[in-house]
Amino acid sequence: MGKNNSGSRNEVLVRGAEQALDQMKYEIAQEFGVQLGADTTARSNGSVGGEITKRLVAMAEQQLGGRANR
């Protein structure tokens, strides 16, 4: 893997996606009743991240499935 000088391994590949991902993160946290932040347990914060991943995968599957049916 290439070295990322920012210190973060999360790299936004689509311009404008970061804002949408942040919005999704806070919406899911609200749905789960999780107050995001340093005082929140890793388990709670992780549940939000896991749900984001599930929803993004579902969105991608829908898009790919739609292309396959054309």
UniProtKB/Swiss-Prot annotation:
Q: Name one Pfam family in it.
A: SASP
Q: Where are the transmembrane segments?
A: none
Q: Which domain of life is it from?
A: Bacteria
Task: Alphabetically list the UniProt keywords.
Answer: DNA-binding, Sporulation
Has the keyword DNA-binding been applied to this entry? yes
Recorded family membership? Belongs to the alpha/beta-type SASP family.
Q: Which purpose does this protein serve, as stated in its record?
A: SASP are bound to spore DNA. They are double-stranded DNA-binding proteins that cause DNA to change to an a-like conformation. They protect the DNA backbone from chemical and enzymatic cleavage and are thus involved in dormant spore's high resistance to UV light.
Another remark in the UniProt entry says: SASP are degraded in the first minutes of spore germination and provide amino acids for both new protein synthesis and metabolism.
Q: What's the protein called, per UniProt?
A: Small, acid-soluble spore protein 1
Tell me the organism: Bacillus cereus
Originating gene: sasP-1
